[in-house]
A protein has these predicted regions:
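N-terminal beta1-alpha1 cap of cysteine-dependent amidohydrolase-like domains
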Residues: 1-79, 83
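Cysteine-nucleophile active-site neighborhood
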Residues: 67-134, 145
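A structure-centric signal for secondary-structure junctions around beta-strands
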Residues: 5, 39, 58, 93, ...
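A structural signal for short, well-ordered beta-strand segments and their strand-loop junctions
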Residues: 10, 44, 97-100, 148
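Catalytic beta-strand/loop cores that center a nucleophilic Ser/Cys/Thr
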Residues: 139-160
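Short glycine/proline-enriched turns and hinge-like loops at secondary-structure junctions
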Residues: 54-56, 109-110, 140-141, 159
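Short, flexible, glycine/charge-rich loop motifs used to bind or transfer phosphoryl groups or to couple energy/partner
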Residues: 50-53, 86-87, 118, 134-137, ...
Length: 160
């Protein structure tokens, strides 16, 4: 008898826009599961296009980047539903990995800092230096690399 699959929910925030993000996320998940011999159950939720939100039965939640302004959607149905879901996940202590646009929306919603348009867009692969020692980051090198291609930034962190 095999072990239960790892349940992974991906919240697709691309709103149908052409992108490489979803393909890369699928490839990384499949490569990871194949290398480690883990069975996975992967479900994609079209959050912006169809207001689809996963339940809380998953082991891993990834919420993607996406196009557009994280400032202009606060009253749109998908955004209201998404931020209520984020509040619920926080209340039940379920971690969610937020990528770019998703992180910016969470920062705006929880007032974690000022979300604003950058003066110029930077594109490239940049080094990231780990400052926190936590089990979550085990296996990462002290310096790892991330893709940089955003138009918005979070500044002036709200420490309260």
């Amino acid at each position: 008898m095999g072990s239960a699959p790892i349940k992974i929910a991906v919240l697709d925030m691309y709103d149908g826009a052409p992108n490489m993000g979803m393909r890369c996320i699928r490839n990384i998940i499949n490569e990871w599961s194949n290398l480690r011999g883990h069975k996975i159950e992967l479900n994609i939720y079209d959050t912006r296009g169809n207001c689809k939100i996963p339940d809380n039965s998953y082991d891993i939640y990834l919420s993607t980047g996406g196009p557009g302004s994280p400032l202009d959607s606060a009253t749109e149905q998908w955004d209201v539903q998404y931020t209520k879901w984020l509040e619920h996940m926080l209340a039940i202590h379920k971690p969610v990995f937020l990528i770019c646009h998703s992180f910016q929306i969470a920062c705006r919603h929880f007032d974690l800092g000022k979300v604003c348009l950058r003066k110029s867009r930077q594109i490239g692969v940049l080094p990231v230096h780990s400052l926190i020692e936590d089990e979550l980051f085990n296996g990462l090198e002290e310096t790892f690399y991330a893709m940089e291609s955003r138009s918005y930034q979070i500044i002036a962190p709200n420490d309260e």
